[in-house]
Amino acid sequence: MATITPSSISNAWLIPGASFTVKKSDCSIKCSFSRKAGKQILSSTQRLVLPLSTSLRLFPTHGRQFVLHPHRRATGTDVVAAVEEQDSTPVVAEDKETVASEKSDAPAPTSQSRGTARPGRKSEMPAVKNEELVPGATFTGKVRAIQPFGAFVDFGAFTDGLVHVSQLSDNFVKDVSSVVTIGQEVKVRLVEADIESKRISLTMRENDDPPKRQSGGSDKPRSGGKRDGSKGGGQRKGEGFNSKFAKGQMLDGVVKNLTRSGAFITIGEGEEGFLPTAEEADDGIGSMMMGGSSLQAGQEVKVRVLRIARGRVTLTMKEEDDGKFDETTTQGVVHTATNPFMLAFRKNEEIAAFLDKREEEAEKPPVETPVEPEAEASVTSAEVEESVCVPAEVTSEEVPSSETPKVVEEEVIATKAEDDSPEKEEQTETLAAAAEAEEVVPPIPETKSEEEIVENSIPPNSATDEVSSPEALASEEVEKEQVVAETPVDEVKTPAPVVTEASSEESGNTATAESIKGISPALVKQLREETGAGMMDCKNALSESEGDMVKAQEYLRKKGLASADKKASRATSEGRIGAYIHDSRIGVLLEVNCETDFVSRGDIFKELVDDLAMQVAACPQVEYLVTEDVSEEIVKKEKEIEMQKEDLLSKPEQIREKIVDGRIKKRLDSLALLEQPYIKDDKVIVKDLVKQRIATIGENIKVKRFVRYTLGEGLEKKSQDFAAEVAAQTAAKPKAKEEPKAEEAKEAVASPPTTVVSAALVKQLREETGAGMMDCKKALAATGGDLEKAQEFLRKKGLSSADKKSSRLASEGRIGSYIHDSRIGVLIEVNCETDFVGRSEKFKELVDDLAMQAVANPQVQYVSIEDIPEEIKQKEKEIEMQREDLLSKPENIREKIVEGRISKRLGEWALLEQPYIKDDSVLVKDLVKQTVATLGENIKVRRFVKFTLGEDN
């Protein structure tokens, strides 16, 4: 609140922080206060006469803020402290615009002095001579400065030209910065150039006629630049700012953009209004507490026209009745609140209406009834709640009372007669404190406001309503204001079970309900964030553990694990297939099932699948899901080995059995995925992690199967002895000298005349085939420069070289995967000779295409026909031989027909025999050979595995 200090000069009041506007030398001087100053208005009896000269001497710092307006007022000079609202930003901007426009029309000497203030002005645009400054001429310039009344453009003339805000566009322009920015290149047209006063007027409008504008401007000479204030002002107010809206009109609008002081609302075709922050529905609480407005761009809002000033429409989201609360505040009626959140509740429309309704019910005269022990206990508990609302200054006053001990003794006897439990003794102490609070309340001074007295007469269930009202009426504010339900609420809640009942069961249920209500929402939210359980589960857990977070977490974990065990019997037909590839050398394909497709697409389930796939990749010893999947033969074999160890021979038979079982269990647990410690938290086992997710999601989850590939496992790399290879290659051979001569002679005879091959043909063939330069040159020379024949020559040579390279050992390569819609997944391993080729882009593309090929062919089960077991081939052959259409055929012909049918049938099961999905004219095996010819290394598709969601293993 702004402080008012007396001054010895003319007995005037000095008001810091106030801005003054002088309407005229003999008019009233108004002092503006912001909302932060308390919104207090001085009454008419407090107006003081202050001469203009004295006021000017008292406030020298505000000398430049005085604006003279020609409207005559009363002859007296009054200082009025008026309540100015925060939505005055547009009006202030208009005043600044008026001042600036008046300054722009100042006399010529002022403009000249302004022009001479910067003689060394440097222009970035080409120089424009004064002879070229003809009205209607078009120039290109850059925006140098932006003012509320227009923009200054540098186009190379002797000074910057002014584009008035009304000349920026053919449409209405509210904000200059929304049309142009500093440094922007714009196209302008000259309206007027006054070389003597060094002023240039420009326009950016396209529909105006320059001669008419010039003739209109030349009707009145610019002698000194003065305006007829009375005529001009009347015309602007009367004609230029006609609005089609009326004060108090309700409109539907859309938020256009947001500023610090408010928001601009589109309320019609081309019409906009300004909504100050203080006129929003929440009184600007969102901007103060959250750091920004509660509105968003594009949001549809319902607004009311608050006022129309100079064509500018100021809007509000409040109803007309909201002003009554401000009037009562300025008249000295102040609500008593125990903390700032109560004030925030009072500013909210819905909560304030609820509190007012409750206060109206409290003001009704109570019905006089005989006080019974139960009623007396409830009344005293209500008095305890009233004492929470009493200010600290009032409760700190100690008023002696001789009747208090007697009342306390009677209440103690009444409560002990009903229940002698320790809880009742604590309640008795609370009642004693309530009785003291009751005696303290009467001496409150009469100067207290009506609102404060009403709050002290809140009914007994007010504390409970205060706890539940943020959840019921303003659920969106509970997270911001959870501190409201902390220590004061807990203190009020403890005497709640004072009302005793005859039945012990009813009292137990009431105590449970009250204990659940007494849990702080902040604790519930914290427990939800830490455990991921439901709100009611967290509430029940906190009530069971009496607010202890650790015990509540243990309670939820036990309950979650128990519910997970119950849900383990449910069927799981949906789920997700995931994959994890580590450095293209370790690959995992995993299937996890759940009950519904909705859960399988959730983020929690996706994260679980990814974590389990990573877990499999991180545990190389894992081979099974659970220990039950291990075959009995392996268990028996392990048991026999353990029983024969020397350290157990000296043990008794019974102890030996237990030791062996423990060792075998430990060994089997190391092979099972669900028994491994979780890699992100080694205190949790994987199966417990799955149970936690079951408790969180509420559906059964099962890890169905997984496959793990390690690059090159099972392959024996050939040990290379370079010394032996070099010695073998350089060893003398008897026929080596004679054979080359014969070959050279044959080549000399058979070689055709050499043709000249151009470098352009070699380059074109290299781009089309990807072969080496010498290979392309030889191919063109052999085919006489024919590109098509050269391509065939290279393809045949490449395939033949690929066949030669197929005998090389391929132990490097890449592991890839492809997941289609999380329902079909493929894990594939493709080998090559060196790691360099395995990391090349061409090889990566081949692996990805082969994985996609395997997904696109559901009947494919093997890599090649040679990988199909002989049992399956024999079975297919027997089936084909027994067909009726072959019984009449001769034996020789029947064999050939069966072989053809079997090869076709087996080709459908082999991946390499399928037509390539991106080019069905090429088989997959031919694609691999082409890649071998391009990369120059042997490539082998070693293995792949395919999972389809829901299929049997």
UniProtKB/Swiss-Prot annotation:
Q: What happens when the gene is disrupted?
A: Defective embryo arrested at globular stage.
Q: Which domain of life is it from?
A: Eukaryota
Q: Where is the composition biased (Polar residues)?
A: 458-467, 501-513
Keyword Plastid listed? The answer is yes
Task: State where it is primarily located.
Answer: plastid
| GO CC, alphabetical | chloroplast; chloroplast envelope; chloroplast ribosome; chloroplast stroma; mitochondrion; plasma membrane
- Key word Cytoplasm present in the record? no
Gene encoding this polypeptide? Answer: PETs
Where is the segment annotated Disordered? 93-130, 201-243, 359-514, 731-750
> What range is the organelle transit peptide?
1-80
Write the protein's name.
Polyprotein of EF-Ts, chloroplastic
S1 motif domain location, by residue? Answer: 136-205, 248-318
Which molecular-function annotations from GO does this UniProt entry contain? mRNA binding; translation elongation factor activity; translation elongation factor binding
| Positions with biased composition (Low complexity) | 369-405
* Compartments where found: Plastid, Chloroplast
Supply the source organism's classification: Eukaryota, Viridiplantae, Streptophyta, Embryophyta, Tracheophyta
Tell me which InterPro entries the record gives.
EF-Ts_dimer_sf, NA-bd_OB-fold, S1_domain, Transl_elong_EFTs/EF1B, Transl_elong_EFTs/EF1B_dimer, Transl_elong_Ts_CS, UBA-like_sf
Composition skew (Basic and acidic residues), residue ranges? 93-105, 121-130, 201-212, 219-230, 416-427, 735-747
**What keywords tag this UniProt record?**
Chloroplast, Elongation factor, Plastid, Protein biosynthesis, Repeat, Transit peptide
